[in-house]
Amino acid sequence: MKHTFSHSFATRLSIYVFSFTLIVFATIMALFYNYNHEKVTSYAIERTHGLLSNIATEISSQLMSVETTINQSTWVFERNINLPDSLHLIIESVVKNNPLIVKSGIAFTPNYYKEKGKYFMPYASLDNKTNHVTYQVLGSQNYDYPCMDWYLIPKMQKQAYWSEPYYDDGGGNIIMSTYSKPLYDNRGELFAVFIASISLTQFTDTISLLKPYPSSYTYLISRNGSFLTHADRDKIMNETIFSEAFATENHSQEQIGREMLAGHTGTIRFDNQENDSYAFYTTCLLYTSPSPRDST
């Protein structure tokens, strides 16, 4: 199956760099308090930003590995497009070969395979405890996937998309995110959305344990500002950095949130309950290659 590219590479790349600066969910903020002005030296600031940069780079690299897995699997999938009953081997391989990916599926446009009916979504999930892969075919009136965000948003945007984090339906309070890649035929028409879902546990655990100084604490927030980690666990996925700032009338925190969601890196000095405090923040940048679409 041949694909065509509709935009110049430079244009597509600039779109993706901008989009993922805002879309990637992982943003890190470390608040430092109980250090007076003399103790917060340029070395401390440089060291802290170095730690944040290293973690942001590590997270971006791991997210990129998910995209790479899907991109590489796409070519295998396209070579087997006429063998729908063999596609389970591809998605099972996806969840087995990338340690971040726990679920994967290929959601076809309605009635793509006439013999399969309106819905056809081969889907595989990995049980990390048993390392057993479960395969099933999804799609029904009760699971109308063409109307779901992970399918609809990349379809409308015509580019790959990382979902806002969500709790896994299977329970266990596992925060996940789904990467969706739209696939196009040689006429430039969408025929499927290839997805990979990952657990964010290792990212949130890493951030929660990050304490550059004894009196420091960290946040991990999504691109919409939702807390993915927080000292108060009741606020995780239930509040945003902005709702907390509003409730506490903390204008500095609101400013920090806006800076973070704008994709900026920086330092802000502010008063934190009469303590001279410093916020250090950065954003993960995810540079990704464009979806294989064709040039006309």
Predicted features and spans:
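Intrinsic low-complexity, intrinsically disordered coil/linker regions enriched in small/polar
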Residues: 115, 187, 201-286
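Single conserved hydrophobic/aromatic residue that forms the stacking wall/gate
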Residues: 287-296
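Membrane-proximal amphipathic alpha-helices
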Residues: 33-49, 55-70, 79-84, 173
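A short beta-strand signature within small-molecule sensing/ligand-binding domains used
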Residues: 173-182, 274-282
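Extreme N-terminal signal-anchor transmembrane helix of membrane signaling/transducer proteins, especially
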Residues: 3-38, 42, 46-47
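Sensory beta-strand/linker motifs that couple input domains to effectors
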Residues: 194-196
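Glycine-rich acetyl-CoA-binding "A-motif" of GNAT/NAT acetyltransferases
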Residues: 190
